[in-house]
Regions:
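A conserved mid-protein helix/loop that constitutes part of the nucleotide-sugar donor-binding site
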Residues: 19, 206-229, 234, 238, ...
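Short alpha-helical donor nucleotide-sugar binding micro-motif in glycosyltransferases
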Residues: 147, 287-288, 295-301
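A short, well-ordered alpha-helix in the C-terminal region of glycosyltransferases
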Residues: 278, 368-382, 386
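Short hydrophobic beta-strand element within catalytic cores of glycosyltransferases
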Residues: 326-330
Length: 481
């Protein structure tokens, strides 16, 4: 199969969705499929290092608004022509924003089916980034509309699908879980000692671990509040691996409560800060990208703590399970899917009292935690090869459904004219590029003029067509002019 994978981010940015696309591309390529990845362009990035083709397209620097991400231009005609000439059998977008627009345009150009995977609660991301209520609402509508326009929608968990439906999506959803790139097994004692060197980690004190972005909406203040409630009853070490904009506010809360803490700072040295509370300490390692070091921390810890109701899949929970580490999760959260309380993990209510009650118990029953970790390893772990194998099978079903005409919409969407126009522009561009011009002085200048003329005409037609479409689409288009 020829498979076009699209996402609004790619290395040098690393997050859960980027990791998904990297693993899809790697496994599919290893299985003999022809893979192309389309993604916004980041300056000074070499995309030729991958064993598959990467087509990068123009982007805007929105890192101040989005925490390091760039926004891809949703109608990059030249780059879409390159993707269309790839002649994909499947178009699979992992983001409904710029990648969603491109997927729809490619679908109209090539006739191949388009799939969207719903990875995260985009409505929360939108509200965190866009503080104007009207603009945020319109952005969410556009995202859901792009999802509705795809031939199939997949979700990484049942909870992720429920989130999409709560935003107004009315179609069918196929649950397609993500995998983890940890093999089953623990790190060696030598690797653990190397990874944890310099930190205050007594052998007889329980170690709790969190890995991820240090953001308050991940439920991290709840953990600190819970540990405060048991500070006079149990000793512990709470390790935070990662970085995030709320790191400093978490440290302020820890200081306010009188706890000691340690931080690996930018100088790569571990700095210790004492506190009047005699028991308990918090440790901030900073971000860790080396997978062997993350495995070592997952092996050293007694329990993984993940009090997030934001995450739709909780890959870090499965990574912990790969190392035989069980997790404490919020009951009925997406990350808690597949967890049986007290068997292969632990479920609490979303409040500090419930967390404190369980953590007090956990500090005194670490061997029980270890047994739950073994069961988690055997029951909730799924490798990327297993996950992508499920997707490969589903790709075949999607192609058969498309051939049978099962994805033909009974009613056109209000913005279909826009995508018909974009598809026409892609055809025009590909036609012009396929011509063999005569060789004469100034030829390259003339080709550049022709290229610029085509791109300019697309922009002009976007402006004209927006005047004839409903107000909702016009408002969306104004943000791309």
């Amino acid at each position: 199969m020829k498979i076009c994978l699209l996402n609004d981010s790619f290395p040098p940015v690393i997050d859960g969705v980027v990791n998904t696309v990297l693993n899809y591309a790697s496994v599919l390529s290893e299985d003999g499929h022809d893979v192309l990845v389309g993604t916004p362009r980041y300056p000074d990035t070499d995309y030729s290092v991958y064993p598959y083709r990467v087509v990068s397209y123009p982007s805007l620097n929105t890192s101040g608004l989005t925490g390091g991400y760039r926004a891809g231009y949703p109608f990059p005609v030249e780059e879409m022509a390159k993707m269309a000439s790839f002649e994909p059998d499947i178009i699979h977008t992992h983001c409904p924003i710029a990648s969603g627009f491109i997927a729809r345009s490619l679908r109209d150009t090539t006739g191949s089916p388009a799939i969207l995977t719903w990875h995260t609660k985009y409505d929360i991301d939108v509200h965190n980034s866009i503080h104007d209520p009207l603009l945020a609402s319109e952005s969410i509508k556009a995202i859901v509309h792009n999802a509705s326009a795809c031939d199939e929608v997949w979700a990484v968990s049942h909870g992720a699908g429920d989130n999409l439906k709560s935003l107004g999506y009315q179609g069918n959803i196929r649950v397609m879980p993500n995998g983890v790139d940890f093999d089953k097994g623990k790190a060696s004692q030598e690797e653990i000692l190397k990874a944890c060197a310099g930190y205050d980690l007594p052998a007889d004190v329980p170690v709790f671990l969190f890995v991820g972005r240090l953001m308050n909406y991940k439920g991290l203040p709840l953990l600190i509040d819970a540990f405060r409630k048991i500070a006079d009853q149990a000793d512990f070490r709470m390790v935070f691996v990662g970085k995030g904009t709320d790191r400093d506010s978490l440290i302020r809360k820890i200081r306010e409560y009188g706890f000691a803490y340690e931080c690996r700072e930018e100088d790569e040295k571990i700095h210790s800060y004492p506190g009047p509370v005699p028991k308990g300490k918090f440790i901030f390692t900073g971000p860790i990208s080396q997978r062997n070091i993350l495995r070592a921390w997952n092996t050293r810890a007694d329990l993984f703590l993940f009090p997030s109701t934001f995450d739709t899949n909780g890959l870090v929970v499965r990574e912990a399970a790969a190392c035989g580490l069980a997790s404490m999760l919020i009951r009925d959260s997406c990350a808690a899917e597949g967890i049986r309380d007290g068997h292969n993990g632990y479920l609490i209510e979303e409040n500090a009292d419930s967390a404190a009650e369980f953590l007090k118990y956990a500090c005194r029953h670490t061997e029980e935690l270890h047994q739950a970790g073994i069961r988690a390893q055997n029951e909730i772990y799924i490798s990327w090869r297993q996950a992508v194998a499920q997707a490969e099978k589903a790709y075949g079903e999607v192609m058969e459904n498309a051939k049978a005409g099962l994805y033909i919409r009974e009613k056109p969407l209000f913005d279909d004219p826009l995508y018909e126009m974009t598809s026409d522009a892609i055809y025009r561009y590909m036609h012009e590029r396929s011509k063999t011009p005569p060789q004469f002085p100034g030829m390259l200048d003339n080709l550049q003029i022709a290229h610029d003329s085509i791109i300019s005409s697309v922009h002009e037609r976007i402006s004209r067509i927006s005047d004839d479409l409903p107000d909702e689409l016009s408002r969306i288009l104004k943000h791309f002019r």
